UniProtKB/Swiss-Prot annotation:
GO molecular function, one term: DNA-binding transcription factor activity
SMART domains: HOX (SM00389)
Originating gene: WOX2
Keywords of this entry: Developmental protein, DNA-binding, Homeobox, Nucleus, Transcription, Transcription regulation
Function as written in the Swiss-Prot or TrEMBL entry: Probable transcription factor involved in embryonic patterning. Required for apical embryo development after fertilization. Its specific localization to the apical daughter cell of the zygote, while WOX8 is confined to the basal cell, suggests that the asymmetric division of the plant zygote separates determinants of apical and basal cell fates.
Gene3D superfamilies named in the record: Homeodomain-like
Listed name of the protein: WUSCHEL-related homeobox 2
GO BP annotations listed: apical cell fate commitment; cotyledon boundary formation; cotyledon development; embryonic pattern specification; longitudinal axis specification; positive regulation of cell population proliferation
A single cellular component GO annotation: nucleus
Domain of life: Eukaryota
Entries under CDD domains matching the protein: homeodomain (cd00086)
One Pfam family this sequence matches: Homeodomain
DNA-binding region: 10-74
UniProt family annotation: Belongs to the WUS homeobox family.
Amino acid sequence: MENEVNAGTASSSRWNPTKDQITLLENLYKEGIRTPSADQIQQITGRLRAYGHIEGKNVFYWFQNHKARQRQKQKQERMAYFNRLLHKTSRFFYPPPCSNVGCVSPYYLQQASDHHMNQHGSVYTNDLLHRNNVMIPSGGYEKRTVTQHQKQLSDIRTTAATRMPISPSSLRFDRFALRDNCYAGEDINVNSSGRKTLPLFPLQPLNASNADGMGSSSFALGSDSPVDCSSDGAGREQPFIDFFSGGSTSTRFDSNGNGL
């Protein structure tokens, strides 16, 4: 019997709001009441009892639950708004047009594989700076082919080869080409590197012919012009010093090149 009484009391204490009660509570919420005080709860409860059964705690919990539901609803509406905005923007979004500065492809360095050898070792051509793509006046792109790169490499190698310094070992001289104190220019020799040196002593014999009948050459060391060997002492006897045999023997010749 007691259990039935408790069940009836519990069922009777459960609040089932009527439509008029909900309408009145929502109007109060819209007026700005969010957390009513104890006096406000008693006043609201007295007004709502005219429309049905209600207690003070029912009024308190209704405002708490309604406030939480409104916050959740506003959060969902904001999320839905941002999702629609993002979807709409992504559909009609286009990247900005490329300018002549921002859309140029990056540079890369390419080292020439060809090399030239001289007395100091290998001499490589300078590194080349290429672009994979270049802008043309119409605003489009022009692709550089491998053939164009190879042609440019070939042109630069040719230019580098023409500017290579001549090795001193490549200059050939006649042992019997120069006469004593008879040099091109003002007794100054210019080597292949462009540096001027003074002749300290004669390096070659003077106006002499070898046993095979080879004549004297008119080419001087480091000079592009012929050597004028018409000196005053053409008729006198000239000594011949052999610097290449390693000996110290000095042989004298007459004006015709015959040994004395």
